[in-house]
């Protein structure tokens, strides 16, 4: 990489750190081009990205964005995976790493919290934000449905009693 290209590359990484609330740092040594392309396509379908980075440039970008604590994660052949949806991205990367031994999860950042590889694997087991919203809506609707059921049962019970009383007399 030419010296004149390095500031542009640092700026690209800075933009990724600023615009993506979640970034996973990986080592990709031994992955074939087709495997990397496959991972990129999967990530792109979920509005995420995969970028191979030079460690020194990634460290400079981390320092510029106040993420000094992750600079020690940049060693070896490093790539970052980034997205606005941390759970879905973590799930994709963990599944890919499980099926491809050459992709190693090193750590990451989610909403300015530093995570180790174990935490990212645990994050991948959580339901997505969309799934959580659906569960909350279901929980909020359940009491209203039960109240309607009780009210309907009461009115139909009263109607049966009145009908039975009318038949008797």
UniProtKB/Swiss-Prot annotation:
Subunit structure, interactors included: Part of the ribosomal stalk of the 50S ribosomal subunit. The N-terminus interacts with L11 and the large rRNA to form the base of the stalk. The C-terminus forms an elongated spine to which L12 dimers bind in a sequential fashion forming a multimeric L10(L12)X complex.
Family per record: Belongs to the universal ribosomal protein uL10 family.
Organism name: Rickettsia prowazekii (strain Madrid E)
PANTHER family membership: 39S RIBOSOMAL PROTEIN L10, MITOCHONDRIAL (PTHR11560)
Function: Forms part of the ribosomal stalk, playing a central role in the interaction of the ribosome with GTP-bound translation factors.
Entries under Pfam families matching the protein: Ribosomal_L10 (PF00466)
GO molecular-function terms, A-Z: large ribosomal subunit rRNA binding; structural constituent of ribosome
Keyword annotations of the record: Ribonucleoprotein, Ribosomal protein, RNA-binding, rRNA-binding
GO biological process entries: translation
HAMAP family: Ribosomal_uL10
GO cellular component: a single term: large ribosomal subunit
Protein name as annotated: Large ribosomal subunit protein uL10
């Amino acid at each position: 990489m030419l010296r004149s290209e390095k500031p542009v590359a640092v700026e690209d990484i800075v933009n990724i750190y600023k615009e993506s609330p979640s970034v996973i740092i990986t080592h990709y040594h031994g992955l074939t081009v087709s495997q990397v392309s496959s991972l990129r396509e999967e990530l792109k379908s979920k509005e995420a990205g995969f970028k191979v980075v030079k460690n020194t440039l990634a460290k400079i970008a981390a320092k510029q964005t106040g993420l000094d604590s992750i600079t020690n994660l940049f060693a070896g052949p490093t790539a970052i995976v980034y997205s606005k949806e941390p759970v879905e991205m973590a799930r994709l990367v963990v599944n890919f790493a499980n099926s491809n031994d050459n992709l190693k999860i090193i750590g990451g950042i989610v909403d300015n919290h530093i995570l180790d590889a174990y935490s990212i694997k645990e994050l991948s087991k959580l339901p997505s934000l969309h799934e959580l919203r659906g569960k909350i809506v279901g929980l909020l609707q359940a009491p209203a449905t039960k109240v309607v059921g009780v009210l309907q049962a009461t009115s139909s019970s009263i109607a049966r009693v009145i009908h039975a009383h009318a038949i008797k007399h």
